[in-house]
């Protein structure tokens, strides 16, 4: 690892390069060690942010961290993003504090932030606390008190459903169903100027906002996933979810996927603005749900190329990296947006075998580590320490990148990287890794520091296979003892979600 001759700084650190002048992370030249260090630092800072004077955790009430306490309230999708990252972090680390924080966030929001059952738009979360330290979410940052954002409701709904599958608490299922029922009842076909649900709407009256842009947003990946999972679980009103899902899918194919109107998203922007996040999250959905669109590969590639062409910036081209800007009204490359785009590129490479963008995606992940200080402060470049961009909408991109490319996970450590079912409980012990999935049938990916002596599902020993492809047809596991992703462990089970991965005795 080398410093440029002029020791240029990026974020909190002096830029580091490899022997060819390409950007590597400040934290370590090896991506896995670097990302592991950054994840640990960010999480440590996050869980020690402290509380406000009213006793509520700082993270639950503010969108920006400052030692003197920032005057603004929540970010629009801040709590849903947090649940998303914490779910992945719990599987990766086994830290019970991550799981406990998920419960605290969900319970707080359900107790202090939803529209009334009698409202025109009932049982949906408000995205903002207009009186910051009131302990209540009751409106929209720009439209004002009483307004909510249906797209953020869908995103929070799928995270509630994940938490239900993790904990078994019916409260989270009931709330997720309530969100889905309202969205299914309010869906419209939409058109080029109106999405199937508005971006900002008055909860009590159903009127659209006039103080801020209201009729359209393309941020519906969370809502698609909410409907998908309720249909799979046969919970709530599956038929209504199916109909709403079909209308939403038709609209996405007819409009954003054709005209590239991928805005807006952000709570603090009152006007129209095209965004990276809405586009790239739909590309992620396409790659994870190829059955949704026959042209999934071409359309995912088109979205990723659009993002790069629209929001890529060449200020760091000499280091082989193109950071990604946030949106058209704020053309500043960001830690969350660059790492998200990179993680979707990594998934694209995994799903298609086309690795043309993979090396630069790793450099994009490297670039975004520079915004993290040694103590875990994570600052948007030339801006504030945003609790969306630096925390909930940051960690998940590194964890997803590791899942798509296990060689990016730390070597010599044990980490679960991905599961097709929700991880209810996981323990990384000295003699074994033990975990339990919500579904009896699931597939997991780990990177571990040992070759398993045995793996059981519900006490029944799983067979080892020499090729990962064998798991496409049967239960068992595959372990890579060597190669760039040495320690890769892939497990498939069909009859029990209780898994024990045992080490050799005495190790």
Predicted regions and their residues:
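Extended glycan-interaction surfaces of carbohydrate-active proteins
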Residues: 53-68, 152, 219-272, 278-279, ...
């Amino acid at each position: 690892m080398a410093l440029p001759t002029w020791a240029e700084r990026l974020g909190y650190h002096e830029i580091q390069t490899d022997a060819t002048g390409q950007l590597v992370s400040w934290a370590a030249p090896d991506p896995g060690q670097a990302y592991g260090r950054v994840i640990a630092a960010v999480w440590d800072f996050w869980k020690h942010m402290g509380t406000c004077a009213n006793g509520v955790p700082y993270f639950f009430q503010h969108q920006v961290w400052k030692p003197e306490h920032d005057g603004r309230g929540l970010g629009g999708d801040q709590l849903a993003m947090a649940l998303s990252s914490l779910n992945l972090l719990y599987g990766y680390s086994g830290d019970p504090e991550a799981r406990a924080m998920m419960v605290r966030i969900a319970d707080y929001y359900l107790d202090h932030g939803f529209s009334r059952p009698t409202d025109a738009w009932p049982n949906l979360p408000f995205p903002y606390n207009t009186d910051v330290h009131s302990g209540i979410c009751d409106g929209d940052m720009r439209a004002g008190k009483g307004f909510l954002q249906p797209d953020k409701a869908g995103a929070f709904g799928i995270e509630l459903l994940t938490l239900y599958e993790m904990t078994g608490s019916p409260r989270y299922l009931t709330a997720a169903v309530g969100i889905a029922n309202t969205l299914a009842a309010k869906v419209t076909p939409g058109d080029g100027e109106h999405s199937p649900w508005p971006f900002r709407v008055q909860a009590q009256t159903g009127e659209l906002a006039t103080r801020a842009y209201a009729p359209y947003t393309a941020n519906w990946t969370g809502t698609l996933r909410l409907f998908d999972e309720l249909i799979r679980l046969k919970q709530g009103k599956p038929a209504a979810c199916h109909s709403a899902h079909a209308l939403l899918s038709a609209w996405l194919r007819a409009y954003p996927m054709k005209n590239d109107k991928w805005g807006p998203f952000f709570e603090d922007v009152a006007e129209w603005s095209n965004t990276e996040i809405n586009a790239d999250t739909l590309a992620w959905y396409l790659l994870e749900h190829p059955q949704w669109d026959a042209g999934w590969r071409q359309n995912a590639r088109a979205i990723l190329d659009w993002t790069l062409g629209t929001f890529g910036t060449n200020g760091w081209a000499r280091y082989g990296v193109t950071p990604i800007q946030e949106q058209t009204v704020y053309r500043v490359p960001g830690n969350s947006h660059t790492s998200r785009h990179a993680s979707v590129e990594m998934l694209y490479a995994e799903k298609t075998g086309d690795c043309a963008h993979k090396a630069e995606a790793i450099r994009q992940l490297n670039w975004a580590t520079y915004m993290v200080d040694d103590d875990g402060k994570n600052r948007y470049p030339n801006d504030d320490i945003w609790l969306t961009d630096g925390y909930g909408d940051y960690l998940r991109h590194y964890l997803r990148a590791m899942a798509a490319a296990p060689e990016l996970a730390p070597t010599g450590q044990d980490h679960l990287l991905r599961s097709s079912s929700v991880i209810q409980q996981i323990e990384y012990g000295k003699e074994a890794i033990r975990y339990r999935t919500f579904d009896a049938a699931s597939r997991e990916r780990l990177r571990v520091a040992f070759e398993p002596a045995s793996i059981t599902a519900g006490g029944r020993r799983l067979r080892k296979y020499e090729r990962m492809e064998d798991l496409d047809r049967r239960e068992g596991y595959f372990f890579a003892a060597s190669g760039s992703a040495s320690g890769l462990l892939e497990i498939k089970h069909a009859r029990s979600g209780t898994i024990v991965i045992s080490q050799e005795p005495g190790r």
